[in-house]
A protein has these predicted regions:
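Acidic, S/T/G-rich, low-cysteine, solvent-exposed domains in lumenal/extracellular/periplasmic regions
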Residues: 1-200
């Protein structure tokens, strides 16, 4: 998602890679995870008043919702996933690959499709909507390239340069059809690893 500066609103962003990810067995869902187990944060309420309150969009991932069999998670007790979407394992695209959910929200979480991030809105999910949602998925095994039998995509234009330039056609490049043994880690949130959130 893209946060709107100075406002508690967001808008969805198309990463351009979801079709490729889905072909490998995992896709990103363009919605927000809301969780009854969350982190507190302070909000400016106006007139110089600051209020500290629970914020359901700041999902708290507990140890029990992490893959106990993955040694990379051994030393982690909990994590903050702010304004996160969710992932879905695309079973029909896995083939012989294996997908493991490394982290998920609690069983008291649900999906919100609106982009209003106001902490004072009424959060009233139906009981039937509450369930865990995958936040990190590891896909491993033999991968067939998404670009197999396709034209090599052109490199994007660098719009930061003052000199305009056209897309650069690929030169002396080939596409690897696949790999026998690889791993792909997909995480639903890009902010959780940044300093401000990782140290909470």
């Amino acid at each position: 998602i893209k946060l709107k500066k100075g406002r508690l609103e967001a808008e969805p962003v198309d990463s351009g890679i979801n079709e490729m990810l889905a072909s490998y067995g995992v896709s990103y869902q363009n919605s927000l995870v809301v969780d009854q187990y969350n982190f507190n944060t302070a909000f400016n309420m106006g007139n110089g008043m600051v209020m500290n309150m629970p914020y359901p969009f700041w999902v708290k991932v507990f140890k029990k919702n992490m893959d106990a069999g993955n040694p990379a998670l051994d030393m982690i007790d909990n994590l903050l996933f702010p304004w996160t979407g969710s992932l879905r394992v695309e079973e029909e695209n896995l083939g012989e690959k294996k997908a493991s959910v490394l982290m998920s929200s609690s069983d008291s979480s649900w999906i919100q499709t609106s982009w209003d991030l106001n902490p004072r809105q009424r959060f009233m999910p139906q009981q039937s909507e509450l369930r865990p949602h995958p936040l990190a998925v590891l896909v491993s095994g033999r991968f067939t390239s998404f670009y197999k039998a396709k034209e090599i995509p052109q490199k994007p234009v660098d719009n930061s340069s003052a000199v305009s330039s056209a897309p650069v056609p690929p030169q002396n490049e080939t596409i690897v059809d696949g790999t026998e043994d690889a791993a792909l880690l997909v995480i639903s949130d890009a902010l959780f690893i940044t300093e401000d959130f990782a140290r909470r």
